[in-house]
Amino acid sequence: MQDSFRMEWLLEISQCVVRDLEKYGICVVDNFMGKERAETIHRSVVSMYETGIFVEGETVGLKSSKTGTAKNVRSDKITWVDGSENNCATIAHLIATVDTIIMNFIRINRLTQSGHQTPIGGRTKAMISCYPGNGSHYVKHVDNPNRDGRCITATYYVNKDWDAKETGGLLRMFPQAWPTKVVDIEPILDRMVFFWSDRRNPHEVQPSFRTRYAITIWYFDAKEREEAKERNNVKTNVAVGSDENKTATLLSHI
């Protein structure tokens, strides 16, 4: 009975993602994993950060260096996981849940012959990011400005008792669908945000004055991704700050 209820819930969320991305380009889902799982993910992320494995995030065309140039653009630290690492079982569950929603998203679009019809053929590993307070930020940017294949950004927040009025750290979006408006999203515990990765959604992380964590997965437009590989003549991992060991996982069951 519980499995049946969960599948119905996932389908309902998937329908919301289809509807909201089509209409607004953004979809926000609260209480995504449930409080208990969300707090377990929070503890796992904090524990990983405390081991010192996170590295400075990089940006296209800029190297993370002592000059501070890259830090002026983004000042987060990141690491990549696939869920098989120690103490990552609940993160693996999160990844599987998002995969299911994206698979449902594809099926719904196929059945309705609407929305994004190009097959989504893979994704990155999950990038865990930490903005370590002290005004750490990421300036206004687009995840995929140059057709590198990234189609949908899925970001999950694990920040307990977050109050943006006191600590900042808002995700501010400038959606093309609402050219006269901005959308401010607080990075609260157990909140998931889906949005188009291309130029339809410029966004920024405003200065954060408390440690701020997020987990992000990018899903690929299969055709655009292959074109990007051919164009670059290399099998690169599009996720900035990564290396070839973090290349996309194919969703062969889609």
Model-derived features with residue positions:
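Fe(II)/2-oxoglutarate oxygenase catalytic core
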Residues: 1-192, 198-254
